[in-house]
Amino acid sequence: KWAVEQMNNAINASGHLGISPMASFSGALLFHTFYPWPQRPTGLVEEGFKELAKRWKPILNHADSKGVDICYEIHPGEDLHDGVTFERFLKATNNHSRAKILYDPSHFVLQQLDYLQFIDFYKDYIKMFHVKDAEFNPTGKAGVYGGYLEWKDRPGRFRSPGDGQVDFKSIFSKLSQYGFEGWAVLEWECCIKSPEQGAKEGAKFITDHIIEVTEKSFDDFAGAEIDKEQIKKILGL
């Protein structure tokens, strides 16, 4: 009850401020069972997402009344941690119009998910964007699960923007191509660089990647008025 009240308070505040997208985590009823051994009981996943949707739908309805989108950060440790789980949740909420996505490519690098194709699949749902870098360098000793290593020693670790493996040029291009109108928000976590240097470099990094979207085609100068007779001639009609 307390958690629902806090979510609704945050929604109210967002509505008063005229801010439509609001970030959140989904919570986790199922994540501790994500590895399929021991075998999951039949129906567990379906029931888990049904319950998750049951808890979220009143909040999503309240968000709708305030004109606010709930943007779930697709994040490890949460039941919504990739595209498949987001789709499961969306279906369980009857495709609620206020269920959206906070896109953070760093989490996809660490689970080896195609973060560029993710944009193609979910462009209509992405309403928030974290500019956060990461790298994944597996060894013969550790991989995605990390072996309980400290951050600086993990194969998958977060880095300051520009120091990792995320192709931000392609991300900014895709988001611009699809008409993303939200903020590019610096979320900084790095186990090597200082936060002061990261903040200074990060602001410039984002500025340098912002694309001023063109309002015309580059070859418009060669365009011409429609000439039906010329068209027929070209087609041999």
Mark where each language-model region is.
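Histidine-acidic metal/acid-base catalytic patches
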Residues: S20, K57, S65, D82-Y103, ...
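Active-site acidic/histidine proton-transfer and metal-coordination neighborhood
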Residues: K1-K100, K232-L235
